Structures are given as structure tokens and as C-alpha cells.
Amino acid sequence: MTRLIAPLIALLLSACGQGLAPEAERPDRPVRVVSLDYCADQYVLKLLDREHILALSPDAARKFSYMRDAAEGLPTVRPTAEDVLILKPDLVVRTYGGGPNASAFFRKAGVPVVDVGWTPDIPSVMANTQRIADELGESERGAAVNAQMQQRLADLRQRTDGQVALYMTPAGVTTGPGSLIHEMIEAAGLTNMQTEPGWRSIPLERLAYEKPDLVAAAFFGSRTNHPDAWSPMKHPVARTQLTKSEVVSLEGAWTSCSGWFLMDAVEAMAEGTER
């Protein structure tokens, strides 16, 4: 054990000291890739061959991970410097894993990093997918993912009926123009009941006399998981929407991480109006 720890300490000290390694260039086609969080896991699992994945995050196979089935059987690693560096990856992929300074640290330690980032709208989701695919050396796979996404969007545009939808969370929060959720509602051929921009409390007064055709419920498997007794979702007017309107339950794996898999949520909302 001592023989293992000593060189690791030396490696970490060299990465943090005066003799920092020069920032490594990203390989054209990385073959020893480590993913530090479950958002990064999705892209690594979708775009890379399994033999090129050195390790995934501990959450890769959890229920809220969209690519959880593909993660089965692959090694995982904690997003700590010592655990990652000892694997000697040729590329690290991350969104938030390892903390805010992780990207700078790994680059200075000589390990190139792909930062997944966040996307505010559907076009940027596709642009981000292609950028990540390019950086992973899998441009064609990224283009294929985007082509499929574009086809699914085109199919939905033919089903537009203008019914009204309201996005609801256990905390009683909804969202309007300017959010990715709003774009998803519109992509499903629906009209968002929330017309004010940004994230806001559900419009209880309006719901007292007007109901949506569809509720997009982001309760992730539970309609009773309220954060506290003061949540607007405790109000009878809000609860009524779950029985008087068509309800589509959105899986957390569909809407988290702002990836191509949000199309599952979009299609579920579109199909909800046809029941």
C-alpha cells in the first residue's frame, strides 16, 4: 500500500506545485475516457465504444440516468483527483463532477477535459451534442444523434393542435418563455399556460377558473413528495389539476442534463393530448 500511495502523492504534488505539467492536447480519438458525473455519463455512453470508457460516475446506472442500461458492467470512479489520476485517463468529461475547479486542475495535471456545459434551448442542445462528439473524436455519431432528433421534431410539427399545457413540480413551480421546458412544450405542439418568462409559482388564481388541457408533472415518480407544507402544490386548486386535466408524468432522466433525450419528454407530452 505504501508503494502505491507514495507515487500518487508525488503526482498530486507535481500537479499543484510550481512544476505544473503543460496543458495536454486533446487526443484526436481518446481511448481512456473518464466521466465525472451522470450528465457527462450520458454523452460518453452514447458516443463512445465501451472499450474506450475507462470509468463512469457512481450515478451512471441510477434510475435518473437516461443511459443507465448501457452503464451496466462498466467501472465507476469517485470524482476526486487522486481516484481519477491514478487511472491515467487520456480525457476527462465533466459537467459539475469534481467541483468548480476540477477542469483547471486536470488540465494543469496534463489531462485534457471536455466540459459538457448547459444549454438554454433546443438548437443549442444539438449544437452541444455535436461539439462534444467532435471533441470525443466521434463526429459522425454526433451528427446521427442530431439527425434523429431533427426527424422526431419534424414529425411532431405535423401534430400541432394548440392545446394548453402547464408544467408543475412538487414545489409548486412552473416556467414560461425563456426556459428549455417552455421550448419543449412548444415543440410538442402545445401552448404553455405560463406566459410570463422565467421560473415562477404556479398561477393559482388563474387555475381557479381556467384549467390546462394537459399537466406536465415533473414529480419524478411521486405526486406526494412536497418539500414543505407551504408548497403551492398543497393548495386544493393545484391538486385538482392532477385529476381534472390529462397528466403526463415526466421522468427525471428525460429532462435532466439538457440532452437529446429530452425528446422522450416532448413526445410524451404530444401523445398525452391524444388520449
Language model regions located:
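Sec-dependent signal peptide recognition
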Residues: 1-10
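C-terminal motif of bacterial Sec signal peptides marking the signal peptidase cleavage site
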Residues: 13-15
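Bacterial signal peptide processing site
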Residues: 17-20
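Basic- and aromatic-lined ligand-binding clefts that recognize polyanionic substrates
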Residues: 31-44, 140-189
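A short, structured surface patch at a secondary-structure boundary
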Residues: 32-97, 101-102
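Alpha-helical, coiled-coil/dimerization segments enriched in small aliphatic residues
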Residues: 58-64, 70-73, 174-203
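Proline-aspartate-enriched helix->loop->beta-strand connector
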Residues: 76, 80-94, 201-220
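Structured C-terminal subdomain patch of bacterial secreted/periplasmic proteins
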Residues: 123-134, 143, 160, 220-275
